[in-house]
Amino acid sequence: DASRYIIEDDYDSEFRYKGKPIPALQGFDAGGKVIYLGTFSRSIAPSIRISYMVLPDQLMGVYRDKGQIFSSTVSRVDQLIISRFLSEGHYERHLNRMRAIYKSRHDVLLAHLQSLEGVCRISGENAGVHLLIHFQNGMTELRAVELAKREGIKVYGLSGCAIGPLRQVETGTVILGYATLGEEKIAQAAERLCRVW
């Protein structure tokens, strides 16, 4: 149907640790059918809360006409600072520094989860700032979350992100994020999780 659009939410795509970066679908869109969404919450600072949208040319008029009724909750000063940060080339340098920091945290976490081999399978480790832990020992998501909580560690069950019911193979899956922790805390937390899981 020619009147339909694809919405591409390119969250965390800046952080890829293995292989070449995966190009955005929007970059291949010769027909103007992809609406591209992104955010600076991981790459710059969560507190800024600035997102962006790249619209196909044919939707720009509609946005100008109807999008005016939405007011931005982001201060004009923050928007101008980000604009200048981007236009002066600081963002790319900052992103390279953040990639190195997150890659180092990522590597520390994976190294300290080695003892879980056979207990679980890890996925999502090639990009982003979190991993999925798929338990193969019969542990449920609820049990894994509870055991982590007892250790003072917050992990999330995959079911909290699902639109519908999870398939049976996904019911023992948790999300383990590492963006906000330093390497030492990551190592300590991973060792404690390995003991209880």
Language model feature labels by segment:
Residues 1-3, 12-43, 57-58:
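Active-site pre-lysine segment of PLP-dependent enzymes
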Residues 55, 132-138, 155-191, 195-196:
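Conserved PLP-binding active-site segment of the aspartate aminotransferase-like
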Residues 2-7, 65, 82, 109-113, ...:
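A generic "structured core" feature
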Residues 83, 100-110, 120-134, 144-147:
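Conserved glycine-rich beta-strand-loop-beta hairpin in the small C-terminal domain of fold type I
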Residues 5, 153-154:
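Residue-level detector of anion-binding/catalytic polar loops
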Residues 30, 34-100:
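Conserved core segment of the aminotransferase class I/II
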